[in-house]
Amino acid sequence: MSVHGASNALVRADAAKEFAADVQYYLTLNPRQLPSRYLYDALGSALFDAICRLPWYGITRTEARMLEAHGREVFDRLDRVSTIVELGSGDGSKLRLLVQSGAPRTRPLTIHLVDVSSAALTSSARTLSELDDVAIVLHETTYEAGLDDLGAQPRPAGRRLAVFLGSNIGNFDAPGADEFLRAIRRGLALGDGLLLGADLVKPEDVLQLAYDDPLGVTAAFNRNLLVRINRELGGDFDLEAFEHRAIWNAAASRVEMHLAAKRAQRVRIRAAELDVQFETGERIWTESSYKYEPGQIVAMLESAGFQCAAQWIDDVDRFALTLVQAK
């Protein structure tokens, strides 16, 4: 296995400016918000990895089981896959399962890992180093920038398979999901594939435990966003003055994560040139996790320029893997 990655000093400098600009913009909205991608610094990625191991958060285990069971069929249906692009690399364990279960049809391979977290990229590359005849290229950047980079590169022979797992599609609202899926489609040629993992609608009590676990790991993950603002942008958030809340919005079919102020307070964020007055109970909306029905997933993908090749559903744990091809 070989691993390649470009120097990211300028990328990180631009990312710091973008972080400050986004904090300035989103914290002045009504309701106050922060983009969920900023949850995933090194500590945030480690905390999310811990969340995925909790008994109440079944997405990771269910998806891994399904990838192992259906990986060979994914590659059989596409045929001649030479390049895999994983958007959101995680720890690499699920992609490793997919590639291993698809052997021997998937060698040699070039795998492009796209993630904003350098820690996640390093972890994923380490996991995938166990694979033979695989070259790994790291892209420490946003999904959109990574897709643009790949679209500008010469294409090798064979098909390209984009992989977007972990129900990360659920972090987009409907217009955002459509725009993102169309961006993926633009980076693919006719017949290339996209494998999408998406969580299905579940009972409210199951979702509540998944997003507000009794051990407080998800709460720490959410509050770490304030830790990051304090550290990187010169903020003075009092971490004990905000509490994690997870709310099931049935009308919108989404779980919402918020940070709620437990008392009135004024927060200064120097790098964002921002002073924010929080009243008791006022919330910062940090993440949405939309849940779907199987038919909604297919319709969403077809609207973005794909045709369904296969869909596998776990009816017990309520999760779907959908394989589509660019049309």
Regions found by a protein language model. Give the residues of each.
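Conserved beta-strand signature within the Rossmann-like core of class I S-adenosyl-L-methionine
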Residues: 186-201
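Class I SAM-dependent methyltransferase Rossmann-like catalytic core
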Residues: 31-78
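Conserved SAM-binding loop of SAM-dependent methyltransferases across substrates and taxa
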Residues: 91-106
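Substrate-binding/catalytic lobe of Class I Rossmann-like enzymes that use SAM or dcSAM, i.e.
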Residues: 208-290, 294, 298-304
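Conserved SAM/SAH-binding beta-strand->alpha-helix loop
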Residues: 114-119
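N-terminal auxiliary segments of SAM/dcSAM-dependent transferases
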Residues: 1-38, 45
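A short, conserved alpha-helix within the catalytic core of class I
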Residues: 171-183
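Conserved class I S-adenosyl-L-methionine
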Residues: 81-90
